[in-house]
């Protein structure tokens, strides 16, 4: 088990998965609630934690299947204990080594892709998992433009791939995505960076 998996197992056992759900919830829900999703879509959440996004999406009538993956066994255990719908499935796996024939219309990731160092291999796997015209919505608070979060790598002492917004978008384009980005802020949050920089969402559409 690598350092990142061990860390997130500890977090799952100490209530941090619920803390992350609450901490990310404002900007993620703002973003997800504005998405226009097609009929009969299949959804994947990479680094799903306790499965809160999978549960939210599975409640949409147009969602036919919602899968969450995480390399933390304890996070997946938590997610399975909270299942609300038969549409939901959860798997303990790293993205890059996940052996699946599944294809998805929508793939989502919040604060997880940068734990794959370097990120290019993970992003290539995402591209392969998407159907034609599928979309990858990738959220991150850890990017070099947001200088107040760059210390996280030292604080957490696990491998993390730090890029600028420009570098994120270039990486998506190089992989083959049509790409744009947007920031979602939380104007009432006590943290300055959440008010001013917010969550960076890089959006990639597969041609």
Language model region names:
Residues 133-140:
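Conserved beta-strand signature within the Rossmann-like core of class I S-adenosyl-L-methionine
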Residues 108:
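A conserved beta-strand element that flanks and buttresses the S-adenosyl-L-methionine
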Residues 160-176:
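Short alpha-helix
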Residues 141-159:
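Short, glycine-/aromatic-enriched active-site segment of Class I SAM-dependent methyltransferases
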Residues 1-36, 56, 78, 144-145, ...:
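Conserved class I S-adenosyl-L-methionine
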Residues 44-46, 50-97:
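Class I SAM-dependent methyltransferase SAM/SAH-binding core
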Residues 188-207:
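Core SAM-dependent methyltransferase catalytic element
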Residues 120-132:
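A short glycine-rich, Lys/Arg-flanked "PGG" loop and its adjoining helix->strand segment in the class I
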């Amino acid at each position: 088990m690598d350092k990142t998996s061990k860390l997130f197992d500890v977090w799952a056992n100490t209530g941090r998965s619920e803390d992350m759900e609450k901490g990310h919830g404002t900007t993620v829900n703002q973003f997800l609630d504005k998405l226009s999703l097609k009929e009969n879509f299949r959804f994947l959440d990479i680094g799903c934690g306790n499965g809160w996004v999978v549960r939210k999406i599975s409640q949409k009538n147009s969602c036919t299947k919602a899968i969450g993956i995480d390399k933390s066994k304890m996070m997946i255990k938590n997610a399975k204990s909270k299942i609300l719908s038969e549409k939901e499935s959860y798997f303990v796996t790293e993205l890059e080594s996940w052996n699946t024939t599944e294809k998805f219309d929508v793939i989502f990731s919040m604060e997880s892709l940068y734990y794959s160092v370097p990120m290019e291999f993970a992003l290539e796997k995402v591209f392969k998992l998407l159907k034609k015209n599928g979309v990858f919505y990738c959220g991150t608070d850890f990017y070099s433009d947001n200088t107040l979060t760059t210390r996280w790598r030292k604080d957490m002492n696990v491998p993390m791939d730090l890029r600028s917004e420009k570098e994120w978008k270039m990486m998506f384009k190089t992989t083959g995505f049509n790409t744009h980005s947007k920031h979602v802020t939380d104007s009432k949050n006590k943290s300055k960076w959440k008010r001013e920089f917010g969550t960076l969402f890089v959006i990639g559409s597969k041609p």
